[in-house]
């Protein structure tokens, strides 16, 4: 504990063996104030940096401190991975390039949103990579969970799952009506639960130990909200404003814009399943 060169390093929060986290200040959904940037791999071996979402001087300083430590360890950075294209996860790549250079990996949808002149590598469901270390190696497999955002990926390893924006212990996860998919989001949560990981490393907030219960709560909450939206339409409500007010009557302090956006996401899924239809701008039961 009193060592001048502690084994864990001066700028290191180790969530699991071969999984470190640094907090990048970002403009994200309150109450979260930061995005979790994960550094995968053993000290002194191959490393992968996930979601280094820097866009200002504070974020730059945080990432530079970590990369300086990585270099001191004589580690090699294999790649930068972005889990999805939302702005609180993407980086100013010119700033990142001032700190280190490495190929950028991400889904095709994510890579399209990144302004970067260096090497990019599209990754897909089922792809995997190894990070060799002096004492142990770590293997990570890519799975796709696109409900929160098209092209969102998670990384599955023995240590747990780098789970991006699927669930959090701080606040909630939105499924934007603009490009989200509520049905795919719920299916993604069910898939993560079925993998039965012992830990999730989320995009925001603390790590999630024994996450099966939290994932089940998320699934039940979203399915329950979808039923409330459906019941609102059955009751004769036909506009987004009316449907959202009815479906979120149990949370009167909710932001109206957010409740309407989430109600619309649920309605889009109900349109997909054929349970409701839209006629002259009004939602009706099929």
State the predicted function of each range.
Residues 33, 54-138:
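Active-site HxH/HxHxD metal-binding segment of metal-dependent hydrolases
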Residues 47-49, 54-57, 128, 134-228:
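Metallo-beta-lactamase
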Residues 63, 90, 185, 189, ...:
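Aromatic/hydrophobic pocket-lining residues that form the small-molecule binding cavity
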Residues 17-24, 109-110, 136-140:
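Short Pro/Gly-enriched beta-strand edge/turn motifs at strand-loop
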Residues 40, 63, 204, 229, ...:
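Residue-level signal for inorganic ion chemistry
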Residues 1-4, 18, 113-115, 121, ...:
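Glycine/proline-rich low-complexity segments that form flexible loops, beta-turns, and polyproline
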Residues 1, 6, 231-286:
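C-terminal regulatory/interaction regions
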Residues 10-68, 154-166:
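Conserved beta-strand hairpin/beta-sheet module of binuclear metal-dependent hydrolase folds
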């Amino acid at each position: 504990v009193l060592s001048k060169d502690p084994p864990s390093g001066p700028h290191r929060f180790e969530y699991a063996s071969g999984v470190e986290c640094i907090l990048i200040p970002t403009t994200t959904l309150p109450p979260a104030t930061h995005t979790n940037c994960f550094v995968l791999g053993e000290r002194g071996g191959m490393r992968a940096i996930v979601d280094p979402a820097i866009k200002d001087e504070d974020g730059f300083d945080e990432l530079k401190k970590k990369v300086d430590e990585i270099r001191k360890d004589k580690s090699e950075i294999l790649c930068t991975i972005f889990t999805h294209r939302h702005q609180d996860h993407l980086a100013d790549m010119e700033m990142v390039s001032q700190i280190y250079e490495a190929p950028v990996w991400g889904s095709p949808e994510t890579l399209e949103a990144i302004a970067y002149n260096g090497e990019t590598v599209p990754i897909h469901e089922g792809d995997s990579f190894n990070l060799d270390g002096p004492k142990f190696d770590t293997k990570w497999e890519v799975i796709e969970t696109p409900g929160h955002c098209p092209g969102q990926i998670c990384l599955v390893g023995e240590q747990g799952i780098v789970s991006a924006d699927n669930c959090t212990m701080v606040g909630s996860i939105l499924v934007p009506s603009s490009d989200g998919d509520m049905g795919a989001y719920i299916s993604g949560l069910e898939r993560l639960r079925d993998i039965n990981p012992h830990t999730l490393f989320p995009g925001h907030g603390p790590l999630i130990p024994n996450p099966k219960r939290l994932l089940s709560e998320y699934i039940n909450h979203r399915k329950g909200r979808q039923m409330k939206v459906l019941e609102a339409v059955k009751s004769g409500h036909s506009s987004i404003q009316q449907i959202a007010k009815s479906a979120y009557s149990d949370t009167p302090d909710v932001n109206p814009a957010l409740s309407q956006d989430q109600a619309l996401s649920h309605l889009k899924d109900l349109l997909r399943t054929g349970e409701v239809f839209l006629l002259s701008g009004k939602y009706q039961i099929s």
